[in-house]
């Protein structure tokens, strides 16, 4: 049957009704817009429709009733999904051995070829979070029974235990629907690795941060860095209200006496410095004298050696050897 112009008011009402149906709460296994989903390792292969099957059935019934009422039977109601974004966050440590393959499916196609061309991406779970983007360049009629656009997850993680989740998936997409069809040039799906930093909250910036943390489990009151002296060497118990660690020699001194004691202490230190310098000078002079003595002894020994050599040369020149032929 040929299509006819639809009535604005009636079409708008059914359009809003269909939109409201998609906002109805679904089951626990349904994947919806802005819905977090944790996929367990025990499900090696998972398919999740972008729109819940129960909602699609209600939408089909609402559209069929509207077309019959308005004598528009056969008029298609089209749905398309563009820019299906997935943030795949592994729940395993860095370097973990395992992969996940994500595809965008059209269940109306052949079971062996239901993956939309160029809409498959694979990531390694041990390389951190990735963002995937899938594109659907055409719309599908709501009239097709059992036809839906799905996300397929194929998980390969042999090292995980049974019932262990290996990733969390956050999804978002743009959906278009209405009596107008949609078709555009196809685009390849993309995958991007997220470059992340380090957790700032794990760093303790100052000693006070460490002190506050340790103070929650260890008493730090009345502690000091140096070793405290329990009692001094001598204690004059005859004097009252005097700190234990104050010097006994300056407790009862007057101001003049303290100044004189300070001057004497300064003279004593000066005398110690001069004495030390004199001792060092004496050591230096003794070292120089020892060097001179060694030098003189070496020169005398050398002179004696030269004298002996000269005497030996003079004596050898007076010796004559006889001739056996003259005898």
Swiss-Prot record:
The keyword Hydrolase does not apply. Residues 271-294, 307-327 are annotated as: Disordered. It is found in: Host cell wall; Host cytoplasm. InterPro entries: MPV (IPR000603). One of its GO terms (biological process) is transport of virus in host, cell to cell. Residues 313-327 have a biased composition (Polar residues). Residues 252-311 form a coiled coil. This is Movement protein. It comes from Soil-borne wheat mosaic virus (strain United States/Nebraska/1981). The lineage of its organism: Viruses, Riboviria, Orthornavirae, Kitrinoviricota, Alsuviricetes.
């Amino acid at each position: 049957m040929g299509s006819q112009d639809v009535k604005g008011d009636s079409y708008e009402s059914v359009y809003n009704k269909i939109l409201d149906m998609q906002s109805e709460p679904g089951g626990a296994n349904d994947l919806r817009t802005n819905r977090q989903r944790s996929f367990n390792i025990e499900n090696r292969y998972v398919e999740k429709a972008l729109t819940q099957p129960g909602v699609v059935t209600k939408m089909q019934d609402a559209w069929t009733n509207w077309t019959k009422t308005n004598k528009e039977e056969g008029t298609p109601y089209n749905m398309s999904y563009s820019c299906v974004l997935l943030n795949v966050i592994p729940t395993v440590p860095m370097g973990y051995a395992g992969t996940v393959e994500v595809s965008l499916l059209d269940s109306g196609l052949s079971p062996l070829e239901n993956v939309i061309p160029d809409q498959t991406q694979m990531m390694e779970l041990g390389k951190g979070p990735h963002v995937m983007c899938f594109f659907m360049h055409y719309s599908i009629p709501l009239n097709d029974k059992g036809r839906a656009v799905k996300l397929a997850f194929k998980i390969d993680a042999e090292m995980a235990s049974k019932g262990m989740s290996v990733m969390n998936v956050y999804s978002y997409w743009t959906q278009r629907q209405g009596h107008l069809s949609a078709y555009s040039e196809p685009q390849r799906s993309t995958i991007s690795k997220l470059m992340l930093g380090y957790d700032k909250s794990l760093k303790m910036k100052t000693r006070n941060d460490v002190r506050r943390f340790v103070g929650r489990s260890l008493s730090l009151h009345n502690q000091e860095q140096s070793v405290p002296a329990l009692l001094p060497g001598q204690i004059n118990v005859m004097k009252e209200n005097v700190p234990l660690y104050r010097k006994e020699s300056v407790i009862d001194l007057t101001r003049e006496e303290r100044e004189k004691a300070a001057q004497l202490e300064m003279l004593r230190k000066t005398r110690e410095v001069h004495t030390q310098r004199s001792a060092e000078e004496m050591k230096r002079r003794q070292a120089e004298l020892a060097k001179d003595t060694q030098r003189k002894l070496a020169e005398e020994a050398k002179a004696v050696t030269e004298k002996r050599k000269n005497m030996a040369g003079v004596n050898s020149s007076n010796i004559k050897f006889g001739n056996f032929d003259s005898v």
